[in-house]
Amino acid sequence: MRVVLQRSKEASVTVDGEIVGQIPFGLTLLVGITHEDTEQDAAYIAEKIANLRIFEDENGKMNHSILDVKGQVLSISQFTLYGDCRKGRRPNFMNAAKPDYAERLYDFFNEEIRKQGLHVETGKFGAMMDVSLVNDGPVTLIVESK
């Protein structure tokens, strides 16, 4: 499992001209799932993200987690994170999980984040989405389970 995490001042996701998910501030997650991922991978990353100290304290040091600052999460499914661009000019997406498996694990992942005590907004799995955000910092990290 691979998640691109962006600390965001605000973020939203739109499908067919309608906002389907929106947060005032917190983390925007682009979530990629491969066919080898399990619920254990999803739970590991959910716990890791909830407790990563990437928000600044009063001294400007990254000492607070999203739980500490009472932020929210915007989670977006993103199979293209497993695009392999090493050969040719078109990405190969064979490492991305099949949609039915990926959707189930994506839903499980979002529930695991909620179990950590966070409010989670999502996009629409499998849809073409427009994602807007104001990246805070910018702070962008890649979190992987393997």
From Swiss-Prot:
GO terms for molecular function: D-tyrosyl-tRNA(Tyr) deacylase activity; Gly-tRNA(Ala) deacylase activity; Ser(Gly)-tRNA(Ala) hydrolase activity; tRNA binding. InterPro entries: Daa-tRNA_deacyls_DTD, DTD-like_sf. A motif (Gly-cisPro motif, important for rejection of L-amino acids) lies at residues 137-138. It is an enzyme of class 3 (hydrolase). Keywords: Cytoplasm, Hydrolase, RNA-binding, tRNA-binding. It holds the Pfam family Tyr_Deacylase. SUPFAM superfamilies: DTD-like. It is found in: Cytoplasm. GO terms for biological process: D-amino acid catabolic process. HAMAP family: Deacylase_Dtd. Homodimer. Belongs to the DTD family. An aminoacyl-tRNA editing enzyme that deacylates mischarged D-aminoacyl-tRNAs. Also deacylates mischarged glycyl-tRNA(Ala), protecting cells against glycine mischarging by AlaRS. Acts via tRNA-based rather than protein-based catalysis; rejects L-amino acids rather than detecting D-amino acids in the active site. By recycling D-aminoacyl-tRNA to D-amino acids and free tRNA molecules, this enzyme counteracts the toxicity associated with the formation of D-aminoacyl-tRNA entities in vivo and helps enforce protein L-homochirality. A Gly-cisPro motif from one monomer fits into the active site of the other monomer to allow specific chiral rejection of L-amino acids. This is D-aminoacyl-tRNA deacylase. The gene is dtd.
